[in-house]
Design a protein with these regions (language model features):
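Amphipathic, non-transmembrane alpha-helical secondary structure
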Residues: 16, 60, 109-117, 136, ...
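Hydrophobic/aromatic ligand-binding patch that stacks against planar heteroaromatic rings
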Residues: 86-88, 180, 260
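Phosphate-binding glycine-rich loop
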Residues: 26-73, 87-89, 97, 146-150
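PLP-dependent aminotransferase class I/II
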Residues: 34-38, 46-47, 122-126, 131, ...
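N-terminal "arm"/small-domain region of PLP-dependent enzymes with the aminotransferase-like
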Residues: 1-26, 31, 247-249, 375
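Active-site PLP attachment segment
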Residues: 170, 183-233, 259
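PLP-dependent aminotransferase-like
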Residues: 64-168, 175
Length: 399
């Protein structure tokens, strides 16, 4: 039996939507993208949603909307993918990486509080695996640090504190204390990449909570300008009779979503509650099967939060990195693809060049060295889930 790690769940519904988009004669940003934005905003309970070509672009556009740039500092986790950190570098701000708490995938919140200076302009928490982080703690931290905050644009002044900019790449559909992620932090970015629960092949979106004194429609238009060359009309608006004239308001960027991508998303959204439920069924089976094994797993469903069930993260108790890698190889030999989430950011060459060293992030390294991620996707049959369970137990026992 061969078990893929995370293939997309594409049905005739998605295929038909894409075909209709292709036949429509409009394949770039247009009515389907706008409809997906409306439906996502309704689903999440946010004023607006801006669909873009990736979560990375969404996060960078959020930082730019907030006016963050050279001379500013942005805090995020050392335990994540590069896309949580690289947008900070893109805008020219100083990247401040925080170690995880012991035996946790979340940042050490005491270290977050200690890292805040009068230059801190955003904190980017990461919902690893689809599990919402401790947003209440984060808001307490930024409210306690109000006296240090020096705002530099209208949005910052309206907030009056350090903005929480959530990396929700994994957590589309998750809830924190009854609220959807995307509607908890000040700003949020989501990924719709091919491996995500909800996909548009490539893609992502930005959302925000209403900020008193800030017009949501004007903010939406600012995102549109930033993501389409600074052009004050999109291609669809320019096709209207006599409406060719346009202006370039700034030398900005190109990261819009196309209607072909949005067509996939519209179909996915119709099915999404069922996809989330299937992920929970698989997680429950894994949890039950591994409860007596020498492993630690992430709690996806608690009284406080409901995960999106994106990744099934397993730590092998007391294992070395070499033993973890051996387990990955043995499972691959038996046809089960696994992965590791994540190699901490300071271990990568690009960040070493920026002066980071994994020696300064011992807890993040301890999380990484014995972590393995098992297949978790909605194409898995019950038989395949049973095979993953059997194979994992067998290979774990042989270490």
């Amino acid at each position: 039996m061969k078990i893929n790690f995370s293939p997309p769940d594409i049905t005739e519904l998605e295929i038909n939507e894409v075909v209709e988009a292709l036949k429509s004669g409009w394949i770039t940003t247009g009515p389907r993208t706008k409809e997906l934005e409306r439906r996502i905003a309704t689903y999440l309970g946010t004023p607006k949603a801006v669909c873009l070509n990736s979560a990375t672009a969404a996060l960078e556009m959020i930082l730019r909307v907030l006016g963050i740039g050279p001379g500013d500092e942005v805090i995020t986790s050392a335990y994540s993918y590069t896309a949580s950190a690289s947008p900070v570098v893109h805008v020219g701000a100083k990247l401040v990486l925080i170690d995880t708490a012991p035996d946790s995938y979340e940042m050490d919140y005491d270290k977050v509080a200690a890292a805040i200076t009068d230059k801190t302009k955003a904190i980017i928490p990461v919902d690893i695996g689809g599990v919402p982080c401790d947003y209440d703690r984060l808001f307490t931290i930024v409210n306690d640090a109000k006296s240090l905050f020096i705002p530099s644009n209208d949005i910052q002044r309206a907030l009056g504190r350090i903005p929480i900019v959530a990396d929700c790449a994994h957590s589309f559909g998750a809830t924190y204390k009854g609220m959807h992620t995307g509607n908890v932090a000040d700003f949020s970015s989501f990924s719709f990449h091919a491996v995500k629960n909800f996909t548009t092949a490539e893609g992502g979106c930005a959302t925000w909570n209403h900020i008193e004194g800030i017009d949501d429609e004007a903010l939406y238009k600012e995102f549109q300008l930033l993501s389409l060359h600074g052009q004050d009309k999109d291609a669809l608006a320019k096709t209207k009779m006599g409406a060719w004239e346009y202006d370039i308001k700034g030398t900005y960027y190109k990261c819009n979503m196309t209607d072909i991508m949005a067509a996939i998303g519209l179909a996915q959204l119709e099915r999404y509650l069922g996809l989330l439920e299937r992920r929970r069924e698989i997680i429950d089976r894994y949890n039950d099967a591994f409860k007596d094994c020498p492993v630690s797993v992430v709690p996806h469903y608690t009284d406080e939060h409901m995960s999106s069930g994106h990744l099934y993260l397993v730590r092998i108790n007391d294992a070395t990195a070499e033993q973890r890698n051996e387990l990955i190889e043995r499972m691959a030999e038996k046809g089960v693809a696994t992965n590791v989430h994540y190699k901490p950011i300071p271990m990568h060459t690009a960040y070493k060049k920026l002066g980071f060293s994994i020696d300064d992030y011992p807890n993040a390294y301890d999380q990484f060295k014995n972590e393995i991620t098992l297949p978790l996707h909605t194409n898995l049959t019950d038989e395949e889930v049973s095979y993953v369970i059997h194979t994992f137990k067998e290979c774990l026992g042989a270490l």
